[in-house]
Amino acid sequence: YPGKKYLKYKKIKGISIFNLSQISKIQKCEIKFKKFDFDHELVILYSSGTTGKPKCICHRAGGVLLQHLKEHQLHCEVKPGDNVFYFTTCGWMMWNWLLTFLASKASIVLFDGFPMYKKNDLLFKIAADEKISLFGISAKYIDQLRKLNVKIKSIYKLSKLKIICSTGS
């Protein structure tokens, strides 16, 4: 959970575990880039399965990037320097959508944990503290806040917030 010291991990053969302070001390890291064609395979994502069995769909690098840039810059009006937050896990397709905000020269804010840990409106506190301009969340989270009668506007200054995106049901 946020703010809690990481647990002592058992040593697992072949797995190295580092904390953030250790990573920040690494002096040099050589990254080797490889050039691929526009139509090169990027990722396989699965359909939700709401209309039958889930289907695997191969997405291509260039097409995904162009589609995401269109959605981010035209539909969501994200500009360079904006701060973007989308509550997601790396196993959900929204993770891929979140990462590509970097191509619009926006910063992304990541959160790992239970969104109501010790505070029902924790994610909106993050939005206020980090001056988030695009805030992405699930419909279930919004519904839960409504059921608990949480009044976000009276608690947090969200003057930088331009758009709230919601997914799911």
Residue spans for each PLM region:
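Adenylate-forming
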Residues: 3-7, 89, 112-116, 130-169
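Conserved pre-ATP/AMP-binding loop-to-beta segment of ANL
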Residues: 12-46, 53, 61-63, 77-83, ...
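Alpha-helix capping and helix-loop boundary segments enriched in small/acidic/polar residues
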Residues: 32-35, 56-63, 85-89, 114-121, ...
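Structural motif
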Residues: 33-36, 76, 127, 153-156
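Active-site beta-alpha turn of Rossmann-fold NAD(P)-dependent dehydrogenases/reductases
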Residues: 45-48, 88
